[in-house]
Amino acid sequence: MMVFSSTFIFLILELVVLCEASVHTIQIKDKHFVDTVTGKPFFIKGVDYQPGGSSDVSEKQDPLSNPDACARDILLFQELGINTVRIYSINPDLNHDACMTMLAMAGIYLILDVNSPLQNQHLNRYEPWTTYNEVYLEHVFKVVEQFSHYNNTLGFFAGNEIVNDKRSAQYSPAYVKELIGTMKNYISAHSPRTIPVGYSAADDLNYRVSLSEYLECKDDDKPENSVDFYGVNSYQWCGQQTMQTSGYDTLVDAYRSYSKPVFFSEFGCNKVLPRQFQEIGYLFSEEMYSVFCGGLVYEFSQEDNNYGLVEYQEDDSVQLLADFEKLKSHYQNIEFPSMKTLKETVQMEETPSCAEDYENLKIESKIAKNLGSSLIKKGVKVEKGKYIDIHEDQLSTNVTILDKHGDRWNGPKKIEIRQSLTLADLEGEEQEDADEDKDDLKRKHRNSASISGPLLPLGLCLLFFTFSLFF
């Protein structure tokens, strides 16, 4: 009787494990990102990814709409050793389930910009009042609605370099801050969990710090307008430099008292080729990790601006460039600090109240009140993202991959499964649709998911072993 009882309990525990989600969500705790299950700090070690440039987004395609292209590139992401990609533009009217599932299985998270170059899908930095309307907000909300249902969506960027010169600094700041709050209100009303909203700043010392302080500050009337994280686009470390000659020491000091997570949303100067990426060793060292939460190298694919890690050839093959190998050698040797270490080194700060003015910025603006409130109340119509059952063949690529010398690359041609998706991952969205009253429960469930990929096969084996005791 005792054997039966213990075996029965074990069987129940295994079934519970199989029904819990495997893809851990990432949330913000103090000034860093944290894995909600393990409690370990999450440092961004990634690349910016927009094959063909932002102009390649259309009604028919975007970077996450082609599963074959995703399989080809995600296995190369794994070869680099990254854990995050940033994508600048997508079309929410396309299906992204296969590519997001592949990223999740590969253990890779997404930071997604909500704007696109298509009409009515971005802010006019010089005349934002002409574009900040309900048509634009509907596009933004559709992006948020769709991607908030993937556990590996790490965060959203409300804008990229919208403020980048004297003229835009006079007109755009207030609209960016308003957009951040409006997005957060929509997430609070409709998303299954809280997903942070940030901004990616231009590499311009005239505005970078003052804009960060303005977007950070808390207005008593609209506390939700405070940014959740801040991205810095920086290209000041070129070739062989030091913290002092590159100006990184000044950069770190500028954000030392910032109350939100800060990271490089773009980095990797290309004035010296091949790029050495020497700054990565410092970025994840004690000199910087108390202030910066990692970064994203610009960029994965070779475009006209010559920052690529790989180059797509006319015959559909892909060639790894010298920068790819350099970045790989640095990323694969990174060790993240522990939470204990961070607590000993990170200076915690309170979010400041808003000041009356900020250097080089004009923050007064007459933005229409309650714009988007009706959309927030009723929600937008878009296909909600969900993980799908991916066949093993879909994780492989038949594309010819060449090394930097033009010879056939002898690396893997298949995505390595690092997170096996469970029934909860694959069916969670259907359950949410069936019972909207369980939203609060779902939020708790997603934030308390506990099984990681390698444990799932073990759980299955133990489950079958348990059954064998009876038959």
Swiss-Prot record:
Query: Membrane-spanning regions, if any?
Result: none
Q: Name one Pfam family in it.
A: Glyco_hydro_72
Disulfide cross-links = 70-99, 217-354, 238-269
- Recorded topology in the membrane: Lipid-anchor; GPI-anchor
Give the propeptide segment as residue ranges. 448-471
Enzyme class, first EC level, given as a word? transferase
Q: What does this protein do?
A: Splits internally a 1,3-beta-glucan molecule and transfers the newly generated reducing end (the donor) to the non-reducing end of another 1,3-beta-glucan molecule (the acceptor) forming a 1,3-beta linkage, resulting in the elongation of 1,3-beta-glucan chains in the cell wall. Involved in spore wall assembly.
What protein am I looking at?
Answer: 1,3-beta-glucanosyltransferase GAS4
Q: What is this protein's gene name? A: GAS4
